[in-house]
Amino acid sequence: MSQNNTISSMNPERAYNNVTLKNLTAFQLLSQRENICELLNLVESTERHNSIINPERQRMSLEEMKKMLDALKNERKK
Protein backbone atom coordinates (compact mmCIF):
# COMPACT_ATOMS: atom_id res chain seq x y z
CA MET A 1 0.00 0.00 0.00
CA SER A 2 1.43 3.38 -0.95
CA GLN A 3 1.64 6.31 1.40
CA ASN A 4 -1.10 8.17 -0.50
CA ASN A 5 -3.53 5.31 0.04
CA THR A 6 -2.72 5.27 3.72
CA ILE A 7 -3.46 8.96 4.07
CA SER A 8 -6.71 8.77 2.11
CA SER A 9 -7.95 5.83 4.17
CA MET A 10 -7.21 7.68 7.42
CA ASN A 11 -10.19 9.24 9.17
CA PRO A 12 -10.18 12.98 8.23
CA GLU A 13 -11.47 13.91 11.69
CA ARG A 14 -8.51 12.16 13.27
CA ALA A 15 -6.09 14.04 11.02
CA TYR A 16 -7.78 17.32 11.98
CA ASN A 17 -7.42 16.53 15.67
CA ASN A 18 -3.63 16.46 15.34
CA VAL A 19 -3.24 19.97 16.76
CA THR A 20 0.13 21.68 16.93
CA LEU A 21 1.07 25.32 17.47
CA LYS A 22 2.26 25.51 13.87
CA ASN A 23 -1.14 24.73 12.38
CA LEU A 24 -3.33 26.84 14.67
CA THR A 25 -4.64 30.31 14.08
CA ALA A 26 -4.89 32.64 17.06
CA PHE A 27 -8.64 32.08 17.28
CA GLN A 28 -8.23 28.32 17.16
CA LEU A 29 -5.52 28.49 19.82
CA LEU A 30 -7.79 30.46 22.15
CA SER A 31 -10.67 28.08 21.44
CA GLN A 32 -8.50 25.07 22.26
CA ARG A 33 -7.32 26.77 25.46
CA GLU A 34 -10.91 27.55 26.42
CA ASN A 35 -11.91 23.92 25.80
CA ILE A 36 -9.05 22.66 27.98
CA CYS A 37 -10.03 25.02 30.79
CA GLU A 38 -13.60 23.79 30.55
CA LEU A 39 -12.53 20.14 30.51
CA LEU A 40 -10.34 20.53 33.56
CA ASN A 41 -12.82 22.81 35.33
CA LEU A 42 -10.07 25.34 35.92
CA VAL A 43 -12.53 28.21 35.98
CA GLU A 44 -16.27 28.40 36.25
CA SER A 45 -18.12 28.72 32.97
CA THR A 46 -19.20 32.30 33.69
CA GLU A 47 -15.58 33.35 34.28
CA ARG A 48 -14.06 31.16 31.59
CA HIS A 49 -14.70 33.38 28.61
CA ASN A 50 -13.72 36.62 30.33
CA SER A 51 -10.54 35.19 31.82
CA ILE A 52 -9.31 33.95 28.44
CA ILE A 53 -10.75 36.59 26.13
CA ASN A 54 -11.18 39.73 28.20
CA PRO A 55 -12.88 42.27 25.90
CA GLU A 56 -12.28 45.25 28.19
CA ARG A 57 -8.56 44.49 28.49
CA GLN A 58 -8.36 44.09 24.72
CA ARG A 59 -10.06 47.48 24.18
CA MET A 60 -7.66 49.16 26.59
CA SER A 61 -4.70 47.54 24.88
CA LEU A 62 -6.00 48.64 21.47
CA GLU A 63 -6.39 52.23 22.66
CA GLU A 64 -2.86 52.23 24.09
CA MET A 65 -1.48 50.90 20.81
CA LYS A 66 -3.37 53.56 18.84
CA LYS A 67 -1.93 56.29 21.07
CA MET A 68 1.57 54.88 20.64
CA LEU A 69 1.10 54.72 16.86
CA ASP A 70 -0.13 58.32 16.73
CA ALA A 71 2.82 59.46 18.86
CA LEU A 72 5.25 57.68 16.55
CA LYS A 73 3.58 59.20 13.46
CA ASN A 74 3.79 62.69 14.99
CA GLU A 75 7.41 62.14 15.98
CA ARG A 76 8.26 61.03 12.45
CA LYS A 77 6.67 64.16 10.92
CA LYS A 78 8.90 66.46 13.03
Curated annotation (Swiss-Prot):
Subcellular location(s) of the protein: Nucleus
One Gene Ontology cellular component annotation held by this UniProt entry: RSC-type complex
Gene Ontology biological-process entries: chromatin remodeling; G2/M transition of mitotic cell cycle; nucleosome disassembly; transcription elongation by RNA polymerase II
Taxonomy, superkingdom: Eukaryota
Keywords: Acetylation, Cell cycle, Nucleus, Transcription, Transcription regulation
Subcellular location, principal: nucleus
Modified positions (N-acetylserine) in chain numbering: S2
Signal peptide, first to last residue: none
Record text on subunit structure and interactions: Interacts directly with RSC8. Component of the two forms of the RSC complex composed of at least either RSC1 or RSC2, and ARP7, ARP9, LDB7, NPL6, RSC3, RSC30, RSC4, RSC58, RSC6, RSC8, RSC9, SFH1, STH1, HTL1 and probably RTT102. The complexes interact with histone and histone variant components of centromeric chromatin. Component of a fungal-specific module (HTL1-LDB7-NPL6-RSC3-RSC30) within the RSC complex.
Additional information: Present with 3550 molecules/cell in log phase SD medium.
Its biological purpose: Required for cell cycle progression through G2/M transition at temperatures higher than 33 degrees Celsius. Component of the chromatin structure-remodeling complex (RSC), which is involved in transcription regulation and nucleosome positioning. RSC is responsible for the transfer of a histone octamer from a nucleosome core particle to naked DNA. The reaction requires ATP and involves an activated RSC-nucleosome intermediate. Remodeling reaction also involves DNA translocation, DNA twist and conformational change.
Protein name: High temperature lethal protein 1
Gene source species: Saccharomyces cerevisiae (strain ATCC 204508 / S288c) (Baker's yeast)
